[in-house]
Amino acid sequence: MRATAVLLTVTLALTAPLAEADQCRLKPKEVVTRFMTQFYLDKQVRAAFETWVEPGYIQHNPLAMTGRDAAIAFLEPFFQAHPDASYSIKRIIADGNLVAVHSHAKFTADDRGLAVVDILRVDHCKIAEHWDVAQPVPEKSANTNGMF
């Protein structure tokens, strides 16, 4: 019985790092896709950030503070105040450890919304840095191509 307990302890100790290594086999695009799904689509702000974002997360948006905890502190109340907010991910493009997400953000169902591009740098399966730009979807366009 004691030998079984020792063997089980050794096995668990050896496989725990392997489980983390398996997760880190994810490509940056896969990390961002999982993060964006959990954050934007499922609106699980805290879980998404605690799972996929580095504590020292660098934020380049001049209206937001840097750091994972600061992002959670800002975004949780935002989603509570805007329960009808929705995001439609249009495309995710990766180049090495940089991933761009083009999405349509709306605050209400009848809102034309914003065309948003988030650029994220992934390091060791965690989002380490973020840039974003947003442009209002106009009522009328000079062309018929659409923003998405």
Language model features with spans:
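Bacterial N-terminal signal peptides
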Residues: 5-15
